[in-house]
Amino acid sequence: MKKLFATLALIITLTTGAFAGNENVRPEVLDAFNNQFATAQDVAWEAENNYYKVTFSYNDEILFAFYTTEGECMGITRYIVSTELPQKLKDSLKKKYADYWIADLFKVVNEEGTSYYITLQNAENKIVLESANQSNWKPFRV
């Protein structure tokens, strides 16, 4: 299940599911979302094979949430900037990956806690790292 969350988060920019208006989203999913994000704006749903992805604005941030077809929230993600990372993670990036630039960075919050995922690039390589403990990075493996 943990890898499902990570995989969903990692493919957030690659998701090309079918758009689903509110009328095409199961009532239990809508209820769960509305209970958690009652003041959300600009809500857009995408239906995948076995989950829903919803993109929305909440407290002046763009968030992405993933729900099972039964209405269980699998995780919430948002893009962040490097200054929002915990200090240990920032220090680790500066020390170990100084010759890379950040191509993508986001935060995932779910029942297991908070995780960070980053895509780094340089002229020769592209790597994806994850941190679930907020103190060090490890290569992301699907």
What are these regions (language model features)?
Residues G21-V142:
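Interaction-mediating elements
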